[in-house]
Amino acid sequence: MKEYVRTKANSMKKINDLALPGEIVIFGSTYMSEFPIYELINKCKSENAVYNRSVKGLTVKEAIEILDDCVVDIHPNKVFISLGEEDESNPNAFSEYVDLVSAIRQKLPEAVIILIGLMNGSSFAESFNKSMLSLCDNKKVKYVELVKKGPSENALFKAQCKQISSFFRTNPITMGDAFELTGL
């Protein structure tokens, strides 16, 4: 494991006692570590606390090693996984991903897991995303493929924020919320 990853996981572990159980964790690699999560939370007035436990450069294998410290120990009810982007050269990446999802299901049986598809559009990403779908039951394990292009980086983040925030809800969506999400 890279020293940076272990250091970051240790830092997160130290603040676990500040986290509220039953909330949302985003567990990812480089893309999600740089994603404007807190702007999203403020914009959508999330009903839940959201903890970004993403680490730049995190591989799936490393994610398994730090899973308890970064995710399980705060007992979330939803876990977004955005991993695989650092694993293109790893022939075991998807089997490790299966192990990760299985570990979360075993350790957090009530949690809903949302798998976020890889963004880069490579043949590896396309294959990996298709394989991710095989893990979904649309009850406890769901899949979302985020918008990959926009007229600007700001517009792209806004579109992705709308997609992700729809999973943040615990209460049924109202007609007003639906119009707001679609931009009408």
Regions found by a protein language model. Give the residues of each.
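Alpha-helical cap/lid subdomain in secreted, periplasmic
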Residues: 43-45, 65-184
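Serine-esterase "nucleophile elbow" of acetyl-processing enzymes
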Residues: 1-75
